[in-house]
Structure formats: structure tokens, C-alpha cells
UniProtKB/Swiss-Prot annotation:
InterPro entries: Bact_TransReg_Diox (IPR050807), Cro/C1-type_HTH (IPR001387), HTH_RamB (IPR026281), IrrE_HExxH (IPR010359), Lambda_DNA-bd_dom_sf (IPR010982), ScfR_C (IPR018653). PROSITE patterns: HTH_CROC1. Plays a key role in regulating expression of enzymes involved in the catabolism of short chain fatty acids (SCFA) via both the glyoxylate (acetyl degradation route) and the methylcitrate cycle (propionate degradation route). Required for intracellular growth in macrophages and for the assimilation of cholesterol-derived propionate. PrpR acts as a transcriptional activator of prpDC and icl genes when propionate is the main carbon source, and as a ramB repressor. This is HTH-type transcriptional regulator PrpR. Belongs to the short-chain fatty acyl-CoA assimilation regulator (ScfR) family. Pfam families: HTH_3 (PF01381), Peptidase_M78 (PF06114), ScfRs (PF09856).
């Protein structure tokens, strides 16, 4: 039997009670029950019963809703709120509530009051920042030598900024594609085309400079309107740097308006967000949405082939794939991550329910770490999270050119993951048995918030449980817990 878009809907939603989500949708669109009923060609009383969970939402009604309101197929499933559920689970684990809050309770809370849930997550972020700042003051007060003043983490704020927007910035993405088309750009040799665009439209001269500092990729001089780009960059990398500057000079007002939508960003984070949005524009310009999305579907998301076609590297392709969430033309919802050998995650974004730990650490059983043992080769994994959701992961190491034999070298592993339901669309799933639960590797978001008490790889005890202490018994499991294993 072939897979289709309808079969998962019928299987997942045949007895779905989603009154809270339907009410939320109606209120977001500014509709009354009468107006919603008219749009769906249903009776008002029937819509009222759906909103009060007196009737399940049937497949025909779901199809009507997704068509009329351009909703994703997962909007009315529990997966649609899974990101918020995961964030709240992290919150309750981190603060150590007196009475355990079950996953079912969190899911019900999110379904009925999602905005309150988002507010709780935001408050917790500020609480953690304040706590870390207080710890910094305490450390300086007790330290023998003076420590630098505690500072906020603007990059974490900006990560949250993109995370909260599912890593897709619609207005900026559309602007990049529109400028690409209107300027007569074509794939291939974009570094040269962009240099001409900067000269003709903005009067900016682009110079390939071999005198820039070793770590500098570009340097713009507003007074002379000269953009200097490092000579050691590859053509695709040069194009990215020029496109980033193009965003900062040509889309400055739009970028400022997008940053202004988040009043929680600190002053320093706003500057970082502007650079992040300029980088987003650059990726969207080099890989224009419709053309790139079409190529990704045709090539079954083969990252290397996409990189060859568009003249960019592995990491750039992976990041762009994670942004393909345009309404009516969505790609596979991906998770994008970059980590080093020590497990430090320097880049992470997700358009899915996959949960990154904010408490510290990542799972050593995660295939992204295995990539370092097989440099430059794709490694794959079918992984299951503690909440029961399964994901398909691919990962590969990327190494930047160093500054000579004795100079420092950068080495990262880049991972790209998606819900297992989408894995068959990826060329990397070839030869992998996707429907066999025995192939799934149980992983978690990080030891401190992972409730897999039977995991032999655990490095820290679970914050939400109690460590079992028994003088008369020994165990091969580190930090044995009194909690039931997942």
C-alpha cells in the first residue's frame, strides 16, 4: 500500500476531540460560531457541539478545515502543540514542583490555554536568566579574584526568537525571493551577480581582499561604500557574505520591524537578532524558496546534490531545509542542529516537536555525536524520544579550512532530523526498515530532564525523580531511580 496524505489523517483523527483547538482557530480568525459554520457548510449547533467536545471531529470536517483555513495536516493532533508541551515539561522539571505534573495534564492545559502556557515558558526563561545573573554576583562576591560582570546571553534569546517562529520568517523570505526574481538572478555564479547588484542598486563596490584579518569574512565601510570580502572564501561563501550585507543595507527597515515584534529581547539581543535575520535573508536569497523546495522534492532531499546544484555547502543546505514552512508550500518539518565534539550545541532550530534541553547536555546515544567517528560520511538513526515520538536523523561532519598546519581548525557535526512519518521521502531512508520498533534507538533531550531511568548511559540523575539508595543491592544503572522506567 502506498503512503498518502489522507491515510494518516484517517488513522490519527477518526475519534479526535479537539474542541479547544477549534475554538482557538475560530477566535484567531475573528469568526463567530455562525460564521465558522457557514464557511464549513455546517449547522451552528454542530459547530457548538464540536467546540464543547460533545462530538469528535470527523475526517471530512478535518479536510474542510485544512482546505478552507490552510492548516497543516497535524493542526488538530496533539503533535501541533507538542513543542509547547515539551517546553512546559522542561519548566516543571527544572523548577522541581512539589507534586509531579503528568504529561496528560500538561497536554490538556496546553490544548485549552496555550497562551498561558507560552507566558509560563517566557516567565521561566526570564527566571533562569535572573538566577544565572544572581549566581554570577554570588561568585564574584566570594571569589578571590575579580570576575567579569555577569552578562545576559543574547544568542540564547535569539535562538528562542527563531524557535518561537518555527524557524520561518515569512516577510523576509518573501522579500528575498522577490528580490532574486526581480533582479534577474540565476543559480550559479551568484557571488559575481551579487557584486553587480550591490554596485548597480546601492552604489557599493565589492572587493575581494587578501588583507583582511584571518578571522574576518567581510568588512563593510559605510563611509566609502566598499564591501571587502575575504579572498579565501569559496564562491558560495562569498555570495552568502555579500547577500548578508545586501540584507542589512536593502532590508534594514523590514528587519527592524521584525525585531520589534518581540518586546522581550534585550538591547544586545536585538543587535544579534538583526544579524541573524540578515543571515536568514542571505540563505533565502541564495536558495529561493520555490526553486529550492521544488529541487528538494525532486532530489528526495539529497543534501549533497542540492549543494552541488545551488553552489553552497552541506550546513547551508541543511539550515535552509529547516526553514521550508511557507503556508501552502511546506516542505518536511526538519530539526537542524550543529554540535562540536564536546557536545556543545552551537546552532539549533526546529519546526517540529523535537525538544532541546535547556538544563544542560545532550543525549550521548544521539547519532549526531557518532558522526565524528566517521568523518565526512552520512550516518543515520531512527530514534525515539521519551514522549513516544520517533524521528529519523542524518548527520555528517563539516570542517572549515584552517589557518595552515599549525593554525586552529573548526570541526562540527551537522544533524538534520524529521518525524519518522516523513522519513520515506528522504533518499537517506533507502535500506532502512522504518516500521520496525526494534530499530528505534531510545534517546532523550538530556540526562537531567530525561526520565529513561533504565538508561545505562546516564550521566546525571533525573531532576524529576528520586535516586534509589539501597545498601543491600548493587546496580549496573548509574543513579538508579525509584521511578518506573520509560
Amino acid at each position: 500500500m502506498t503512503r498518502s496524505n489522507v491515510l494518516p489523517v484517517a488513522r490519527t483523527y477518526s475519534r479526535t476531540f479537539s474542541g479547544a483547538r477549534l475554538r482557538r482557530l475560530r477566535q484567531e480568525r475573528g469568526l463567530t460560531q455562525v460564521a465558522l459554520a457557514k464557511a464549513l457548510d455546517l449547522s451552528t449547533s454542530y459547530v457548538n457541539q464540536l467546540e464543547n467536545d460533545q462530538r469528535p471531529i470527523t475526517v471530512p470536517v478535518l479536510l474542510l478545515l485544512t482546505e478552507r483555513f490552510d492548516l497543516s495536516a497535524q493542526y488538530f493532533s496533539s503533535d501541533s502543540d507538542a513543542r509547547l508541551v515539551a517546553d512546559l515539561s522542561d519548566v516543571f522539571t527544572d523548577i522541581g514542583v512539589e507534586h509531579a505534573v503528568s504529561g496528560a495534564q500538561i497536554e490538556e492545559f496546553v490544548a485549552r490555554m496555550p497562551e498561558v502556557g507560552h507566558s509560563l515558558v517566557a516567565v521561566h526563561r526570564r527566571l533562569r536568566a535572573a538566577t544565572e545573573e544572581l549566581e554570577g554576583y554570588r561568585s564574584r562576591a566570594t571569589a578571590e579574584t575579580e570576575l567579569p560582570p555577569a552578562r545576559p546571553m543574547p544568542f540564547e534569546e535569539v535562538r528562542d526568537f527563531f524557535y518561537d517562529r518555527n524557524n520561518y520568517i515569512h516577510d523576509l523570505d518573501m522579500a528575498a525571493e522577490r528580490m532574486f526574481t526581480e533582479s534577474g538572478m540565476r543559480t550559479g555564479g551568484l557571488d559575481i551577480q551579487l557584486a553587480e547588484l550591490m554596485r548597480d542598486r546601492f552604489g557599493i563596490s565589492v572587493v575581494i581582499d587578501d588583507n583582511l584579518p584571518d578571522t574576518a569574512k567581510r568588512r563593510y565601510h559605510p563611509d566609502t561604500k566598499v564591501l571587502r570580502v575575504a579572498h579565501w572564501l569559496m564562491p558560495g561563501q562569498r555570495a552568502f557574505q555579500i547577500a548578508t550585507q545586501l540584507a542589512l543595507v536593502g532590508q534594514s527597515d523590514l528587519i527592524s520591524s521584525i525585531v520589534a515584534t518581540d518586546d522581550q529581547l534585550s538591547t544586545e539581543a536585538r543587535g544579534v537578532a538583526r544579524i541573524g535575520l540578515a543571515n536568514y535573508f542571505a540563505g533565502a536569497f541564495l536558495l529561493p524558496y520555490r526553486e529550492f523546495h521544488r529541487a528538494a522534492e525532486q532530489l528526495r532531499y539529497d543534501i549533497d546534490l542540492l549543494g552541488r546544484r545551488f553552489g553552497v555547502g552541506f550546513e547551508t543546505v541543511c539550515h535552509r531545509l529547516s526553514t521550508l514552512q511557507r503556508p501552502r508550500q511546506r516542505g518536511i518539518p526538519f530539526i537542524f542542529v550543529r554540535t562540536d565534539k564536546a557536545g556543545n550545541i552551537s546552532k539549533r532550530q526546529s519546526a517540529t516537536a523535537f525538544h532541546f534541553s535547556r538544563v544542560g547536555g545532550s543525549c550521548p546515544l544521539w547519532v549526531v555525536h557518532d558522526a565524528f567517528a566517521q568523518p565526512e560520511r552520512i550516518v543515520r538513526q531512527v530514534a525515539q524520544m521519551p514522549d513516544g515520538r520517533s524521528y529519523f536523523w542524518v548527520a555528517k561532519t563539516t570542517a572549515a579550512d584552517g589557518l595552515g598546519y599549525l593554525g586552529p581548525h573548526k570541526n562540527f557535526a551537522v544533524g538534520l532530523g524529521c518525524d519518522l512519518a516523513h522519513a520515506h521521502k528522504l533518499v537517506y531512508s533507502t535500506g532502512v526498515v522504518l516500521d520496525d520498533p526494534s530499530t528505534e534507538v531510545p534517546i532523550g533531550a538530556g540526562c537531567k530532564i530525561c526520565n529513561r531511568t533504565s538508561c545505562a548511559q546516564r550521566a546525571f540523575p533525573y531532576l524529576g525523580g528520586r535516586v534509589a539508595v539501597d545498601e543491600n543491592a548493587g546496580s549496573s544503572l548509574p543513579y538508579s531511580s525509584t521511578e518506573q522506567s520509560v
